[in-house]
Design a protein with these regions (language model features):
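TPR alpha-solenoid repeat register
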Residues: 84, 118, 152-155, 191, ...
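Alpha-helical linker/edge segments of TPR/alpha-solenoid repeat scaffolds
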Residues: 53-72, 130-137, 164-173, 199-224, ...
């Protein structure tokens, strides 16, 4: 079955969405979803050894493999199905149809599970629908997937707000989340709101030591730093980009890694990746040398005969 939609079709509908023309954009997007789902049912069925995705980049694909440890063959589809569902969710949100928006964003996450903005927006929809546990769970899931400081900060800010809810109150954990969010994205509005709420409601919380509040987060199972695995993936992709001569992309990815885990940790990861690449290249060179030696020996034996 031929793919019935194209990137141009999605972009065409997005133009109406950007203009606020929901009356035109919504039926266009719904038709694209209908056509795409017919294609998905016929051509993209999940199998035991194969799954289909619409990752945005090579980095996301690598990060998914390392974080999820999914052994299946990962097949990249030709059209960004995730964008189509995200657009659909946005249209539903504008119409205050939060249940339909939630369902659409869940599909966006399914097609690009490494897009943390989808996860965070979906978390807010669950919160609007009064499912605070799922709001917190999705925010938590961002921490091991976030590839930039802003997304990680927003996830920490959400968890901080969760720890201020009456039924789950843990002020020390909330303070810990606020401090981590502040380090990652000091100007983020979610971070600012959390800090303001803590300051207004619990003014003495500022006196708690970092050791105490980070220890409380550890007890709650919340990591106190973004994922080193994600930073490694960023540096690996930066190294590949540099090898391909794309210095701009290499710099962009390296800066993301630095902003995520800090300059010292980033430098250590760069050193580790370079050493690993050097070892791998040495092994390949040795294998080629051994293979060449065997070929020469075989040729000499043939000449002797």
């Amino acid at each position: 079955m031929d793919l019935p939609i194209s990137l141009q079709d999605i972009t065409y509908a997005e133009n109406y969405l950007a203009q606020g023309d929901l009356a035109t954009a919504t039926p266009l997007l719904e038709r694209l979803v209908e056509l795409a789902e017919e294609y998905i049912d016929a051509e993209c069925k999940t199998e035991e050894n194969r799954q289909y995705f619409s990752f945005d980049s090579k980095f996301e694909r690598l990060a998914y493999r390392r974080v999820e440890k999914d052994p299946r063959e990962l097949v990249q589809v030709e059209v960004p199905f995730d964008r189509r569902y995200s657009d659909m969710a946005f249209a539903y949100i504008r119409q205050q149809d939060y249940v339909s928006a939630r369902n659409a964003l869940m599909q966006a996450v399914r097609w690009d599970p490494m897009n943390c903005n989808y996860r965070l927006d979906l978390a807010e929809l669950f919160r609007a629908l009064e499912d605070k546990q799922e709001w917190a769970s999705l925010s938590f899931s961002v921490l091991e997937r976030a590839s930039d400081g802003r997304c990680a900060a927003r996830a920490y800010a959400n968890l901080g707000q969760y720890f201020l809810e009456p039924e789950t109150e843990n002020v020390s954990a909330a303070v810990g989340c606020a401090r981590l969010a502040l380090r990652l994205a000091p100007g983020d509005s979610h971070t600012t709101r959390l800090l303001s709420k803590i300051h207004a409601t619990y003014p003495d919380a500022a006196d708690e030591s970092d050791e105490h509040v980070m220890g409380e987060l550890a007890l709650q199972g919340v990591p106190t730093s973004p994922s080193a695995e994600i930073a490694i993936c960023l540096i690996m992709c930066a190294t590949d980009a540099a090898s391909d001569g794309d210095k701009q992309e290499a710099t962009r990815l390296t800066v993301r890694a630095r902003d995520l885990v800090g300059e010292e940790a980033c430098a250590a990861i760069i050193k580790l990746v370079r050493e690993s690449d050097a070892e791998l290249n040495a092994e390949r060179k040795a294998k080629r040398g051994a293979a060449s030696g065997k070929a020469d020996d075989a040729e000499e034996a043939g000449d002797a005969q």
